[in-house]
Structures are given as C-alpha cells and as structure tokens.
Regions:
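N-terminal domain-onset segments
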Residues: 1-79, 143-246
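Short, surface-exposed beta-edge/turn micro-motifs
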Residues: 79-81, 94
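An exposed acidic His-Trp-rich patch
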Residues: 88-185
Length: 246
C-alpha cells in the first residue's frame, strides 16, 4: 500500500457526500465534550497563534492541488509546527501536519532528509500564502522571516480525493513554485479571493519589496531539479518481540 491516487473503496468514498463516516453527535455527547473542555487545560492547542491559508501540491502528482489552512504554533525562533485543515470552518477536517524550520536549521539536516522539504519564498512573495483577516502591515515582519524557511508537510487525509476517513499512508506535499508544474490553478486562487474579499494580485504587489533569500538549497523542492516525487510505501516487517518489562 502506498500514497498513490487510487480512489477509495465505494463505501469509503464521498459519492457526493463530503461528511466523515459516523453518526451525528448526540446531545449527551455535546454536553460531555463541553464539560471536558471546561475542566482540562488544552495547553498545546492554546499555543496556536496564527492562521495561514495557502495551497499545496501532492509530491507524486502536482496536478492535485488543495487549499490548506495552517494553524501555527511557534516553538522557538527557528521552529514552527502547524496543524493543517482543509477549511477554516467549524467542521474543518484535520488533514495533516507541517513543520517549518529556519534556513539555519535546514542547512544542518542530512541531504536525504532535505529532499522531503520545500521552500517558502515564492509562496509568500506571490501572496499565495496569506493570513486571513489580518492586516498586511501587522503580519509583514513574520512573512518576511518566513520567506527564508523550509517546510515538511505530510497529508494524512486526502479529502480532495473524496475520502471520508483518513486512508492509507501519508502523502508528501510540496509548495507552489514559479515554474509551470508548480503553478497553482487560477480558479483555486479566485475562489479564495471571493471567499475573503481580497485580491491576491494586489497583495502580491504589496510584497514586491520583500527580500529574496540569498540562496535556496537545491535539495529542497527536489522535484524541480530531478522531476521526481516521493510516495510512502507500507511493508510488513518483523517485530522486536521483547517485552518492555519482565
């Protein structure tokens, strides 16, 4: 089993229904969840400080492009972690996770690891990456820092394929780039513009003075130089049959 484009079995596909499989929540369950939320700290979730909307392309098939919503926690000056959803609505589905590191951290990674990462410079300068409803003046310093970062994004739920549950292994995602294979479909951008009442073109013009990174490591965006993507394959393996305690 690998992270390919094979459609899901009919009973797990959408068939026009995009809702996840399962019964509607009962009143009792709603009350239990509200009570639990009041009693527990949920500290990791409360560290989320940013919402970014952008687009991602499947590493093995870049014609498959999705709008993504990153809910970002900054761990330190060089490292961020993102819970990625397919929308910013209350019923948004958690479709993956992205880790973001500074260029300083990235340069210390092994070359084989670097191949799994993508650059952010074009994505941000072209205004494909936006922070919905946040004034550009407020987010500008953070965006300028992010142009020099690299991300590794694993998609765990291919909702664009019609999957009603997370199926199969994760798929590696890539960022948009200024070459034909990496360009985002115009209709996706126009749809987002209409939703938020923005002009991506106008935002792009406002970012024209953002500094370009002096150098983007060629191991990132591996497909641009080599025309190869990556898929995850699942294989049976022998277990270590040693008890963790006597």
């Amino acid at each position: 089993m690998s992270s390919t484009d094979q459609p899901p079995p009919s009973h797990l596909g959408s068939g026009g229904d995009l809702q996840p499989l399962g019964k509607p929540m009962s009143i009792e369950q709603h009350l239990l969840d509200k009570g639990a939320a009041m009693l527990q700290s949920l500290k990791p979730v409360k560290q989320i400080s940013q919402h970014a909307c952008t687009f991602a392309l499947y590493s093995h098939d870049m014609t498959r492009q999705i709008e993504t919503h990153h809910y970002i926690t900054r761990i330190n000056q060089d490292f961020l972690q993102c819970a990625v959803y397919d929308s910013d609505e209350s019923n948004g589905r958690l479709i993956g996770v992205e880790y973001i590191v500074s260029d300083r951290i990235f340069e210390g990674l092994p070359p084989e690891e670097q191949k799994l990462w993508h650059s952010h410079a074009y994505e941000i300068k072209s205004a494909l990456w936006i922070n919905p409803r946040a004034p550009e003046m407020v987010v500008k310093p953070e965006l300028q820092n992010l142009t020099k970062t690299y991300g590794k994004f694993w998609c765990t739920w291919q909702t664009d394929r019609g999957d009603r549950l997370p199926l199969g292994p994760p798929a590696l995602m890539m960022s948009p780039q200024a070459v034909s294979l990496g360009m985002v479909k115009p209709d996706l951008v126009l749809k987002r513009d209409a939703k938020y009442g923005i002009s991506t073109e106008a935002i792009r013009d406002s970012r024209v003075e953002f500094e370009e990174p002096e150098w983007i490591n060629p191991n990132a965006d591996y497909w641009k130089q080599h025309g190869k993507g990556f898929v995850v394959d699942i294989e049976p393996t022998e277990m270590k049959k040693i008890a963790p305690f006597p």
